A protein has these predicted regions:
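H-loop/switch region of ABC-family ATPase nucleotide-binding domains
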Residues: 134-135
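Conserved ABC ATPase "signature" region
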Residues: 43, 47, 53-70
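Helical segment within the ABC ATPase nucleotide-binding domain
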Residues: 114-126
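Catalytic Walker B motif of ABC-type/P-loop ATPase nucleotide-binding domains
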Residues: 99-103
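Conserved ABC ATPase signature
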Residues: 74-81
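A short, surface-exposed alpha-helical micro-motif characterized by mixed small hydrophobic
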Residues: 140-142
Length: 181
């Protein structure tokens, strides 16, 4: 990753332990330990982040993403969609103040996509900063506040929902990139 300047998370140096404890990341390609179960992945993250999430809250997250009956499945037994759900649950289990989701809906079934959108709106209502990187603009149509458009690794423009009203995201994207409308 090449960049100029500094990166901060809630006014903390991004590499600091304090910043890492409030920051969650859901990668585009979830990485799972083959020999750990779904539950062990959750517990691993809870301990690594010294999370104060309760067992009841963990169960509620697993239930929302239909993983309660998959807790004993090993990482190497899961489909891409299931791994994505586990990755999302792990991120939520640290109770982040900032969360970065990279193509989070790829591989998810329609019900899980709907659930993730609801979770994102709940996080937003609770003051969590949410960053979503996606090429599937229609997936974030009803949940975005600010859109940055990148081209060749550089931000070429941005919009806020307040500025553009009901204009569709793909129209805004094409406006910036000069593509088809």
């Amino acid at each position: 990753l090449r960049y100029e300047g500094g990166i901060g998370i809630q006014k903390m140096e991004a590499h600091s332990m304090e910043a890492k404890k409030i920051f969650a990341y859901v990668p585009e390609l979830p990485a799972m330990f083959d020999a750990l179960t779904v539950r062990e992945h959750i517990e691993y993250v809870r301990k690594a982040y010294d999370s104060n999430i309760t067992d009841q809250e963990v169960e509620a997250i697993l239930t929302r993403f239909e993983l309660e009956d998959k807790q004993d499945k090993l990482g190497n037994e899961l489909s891409k969609g299931m791994m994505q759900k586990v990755s999302i649950c792990c991120a939520l289990c640290i109770k982040p103040q900032v969360i970065l989701l990279d193509e989070p809906m790829v591989g998810l079934d329609p019900k899980a996509i709907k659930e993730l959108k609801e979770v994102i709106l709940e996080l937003k209502e609770n003051g969590v900063t949410i960053l979503i990187s996606t090429h599937m603009l229609e997936m974030v149509e009803n949940i975005w506040d600010v859109m940055f458009v990148m081209e060749k690794g550089h931000i070429i423009g941005s919009y806020s929902k307040e500025e553009v009203g009901d204009k569709e995201l793909d129209a805004l994207f094409f406006e910036l990139t000069g593509g088809e409308k």
